[in-house]
Amino acid sequence: LLSRGLGDVYKRQVQFPVVMPASLWQESGRYDSIGKELLRFTDRNGAPMVLGMTHEEAAVQLVREYGQSYAKYPFMIYQIQTKFRDEARPRAGLIRVREFTMKDAYSFHTSQEDLEQYYDKCHKAYERIYARAGIPEVVSVKSDSGMMGGNVSHEFMLLTPIGEDSIVICNECDYRANMEAAENIVENETEAMQELTKVHTPEMHTIEQVC
């Protein structure tokens, strides 16, 4: 279902290694910025290694070797692979576990405009996938990019009574966001000044009562 749904937006399926040299993560800075969720170990020669929780670093390394020509962009790849993340509180069956199967995708562009157009195309592809799967309770919300970084991020939330996250939904403007990314915009309402007039206010002791 995923491969069919993503066929129009991702043309290349790859399979990155689960075990990666720590040097890739040290170069990006995430080796130090990510906490204990990243599983680290050393091989028999003492070289530091990691178990992939995501593969941004590996994708960049691939493009370094492959994407030397301008004509090869935009460049999109995806994989469906086992990930490892040392969760502090594994729970809820398949909702949050240390080992899981995830579809992750990476794209590379020559302009911000091309990236934004492609992001919207991918977002619509996921909406079609959930619709085909018959999961109407899924909603797309604005989210915080977190350790992944980036300026724009959305996540698809499955509405369930056992969920732990809260989301904000505006029925008037269709704004949706999780609590980490939600923004509150207060508009100042102004009215024309009116002339002062005397008002009879018997048995009223506060401004609220007069209003």
Model feature map: region roles:
Residues E37, T42, A47, F75-E113, ...:
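Residues forming anionic-ligand binding surfaces in small-molecule and nucleic-acid pockets
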